Amino acid sequence: MKVISNFQNKKILILGLAKSGEAAAKLLTKLGALVTVNDSKPFDQNPAAQALLEEGIKVICGSHPVELLDENFEYMVKNPGIPYDNPMVKRALAKEIPILTEVELAYFVSEAPIIGITGSNGKTTTTTMIADVLNAGGQSALLSGNIGYPASKVVQKAIAGDTLVMELSSFQLVGVNAFRPHIAVITNLMPTHLDYHGSFEDYVAAKWMIQAQMTESDYLILNANQEISATLAKTTKATVIPFSTQKVVDGAYLNDGILYFKEQAIIAATDLGVPGSHNIENALATIAVAKLSGIADDIIAQCLSHFGGVKHRLQRVGQIKDITFYNDSKSTNILATKKALSGFDNSRLILIAGGLDRGNEFDDLVPDLLGLKQMIILGESAERMKRAANKAEVSYLEARNVAEATELAFKLAQTGDTILLSPANASWDMYPNFEVRGDEFLATFDCLRGDA
């Protein structure tokens, strides 16, 4: 980590804790800043705030009092989940207080080069794939960012010989100014998080910030399956490397069932360790990064063939009586579930879906539901999901929660069938996050296996 003096004796407000806020507070304190943390969770229910107080960091909990900004802060570090129309943020902007993001703070002190991965779907899987391949090739890749390891924490142990492989959400990118990865990947762009950004155009603009400071010596890897990529590619200074499952491109591509990089065959699609057309896209993006990083073809192929997926992201959980279970709780929109379904035989598939609708067009899912053996539907979006099932002429049952849905699916399943949790909706109507939803699926699998 570079020791910089930019924040020495500067009064800085951390707005919102969670993992990233806690990490930013500790990093800034190490850099000599005068840190105040403000979090909406009450102090007696806030272990992170309690721990920071024990380290001598000022904490204010229970609300976000706007008058706190009268204390002449010189910077604000905003939690990514707090929108820019929050009264505290609006007041800070009105007072012309610079607002930093936690990932940009990490960038300022990083000795290690950064590979940044963003997109609507596939971020975590691609980030993990890239780190696995780089490490298998003898490099030192450190996972960081939106994948659960705050960048401002990981950067403190990173040295110049490491590489930070950083998953980045639109929330994290919307406020960056100086952030510059050496390699950036945009997996795809679909209308998600519109409740936060307001429009698809603003959402894309946030994602596009990943390349704002890149130059021709940097590499931007784009999904050539999407028309928007061609439009965006014209506006970047970075060297663009495309990937595609639909056509031969001057980068990574799928042709006759083989994944290539610039005419060099790397691996057969059937040899990939995870199913689904979306995972072919993830693997192509990974191949592009790996080749730019000097990893040998045989190592790339071996690593991708053994890659077993990421928890909650088309995760192969196991089998009970030759019935296979997959946990894809991370699929919180239609596109993610469409891509998950592409990897299975619908006639042997029982799909568990439903949750909180965040503006999905459920008719878009109908072609992918055709021929399904059964659906188990749950959540706030149940009526809309049922209409889609009816249009696809798929029979369905309703469940009160994921546990009940999994039990119902298992009762209906026969030898050789697959049970897939791929909700196509957010989790917040029933669960605090997709991880808790997926964990309930995993726990139910364990119970069913124990009873079998």
Curated annotation (Swiss-Prot):
A Pfam family: Mur_ligase_M
Catalyzed reactions per annotation: UDP-N-acetyl-alpha-D-muramoyl-L-alanine + D-glutamate + ATP = UDP-N-acetyl-alpha-D-muramoyl-L-alanyl-D-glutamate + ADP + phosphate + H(+)
Enzyme's top EC category: ligase
GO CC field: cytoplasm
EC number assigned by the record: 6.3.2.9
Keyword list, A-Z: ATP-binding, Cell cycle, Cell division, Cell shape, Cell wall biogenesis/degradation, Cytoplasm, Ligase, Nucleotide-binding, Peptidoglycan synthesis
Keyword field contains Membrane: no
Family: Belongs to the MurCDEF family.
Function: Cell wall formation. Catalyzes the addition of glutamate to the nucleotide precursor UDP-N-acetylmuramoyl-L-alanine (UMA).
Name the record gives this protein: UDP-N-acetylmuramoylalanine--D-glutamate ligase
Organism per entry: Streptococcus pyogenes serotype M12 (strain MGAS2096)
Organism ancestry: Bacteria, Bacillati, Bacillota, Bacilli, Lactobacillales
Gene: murD
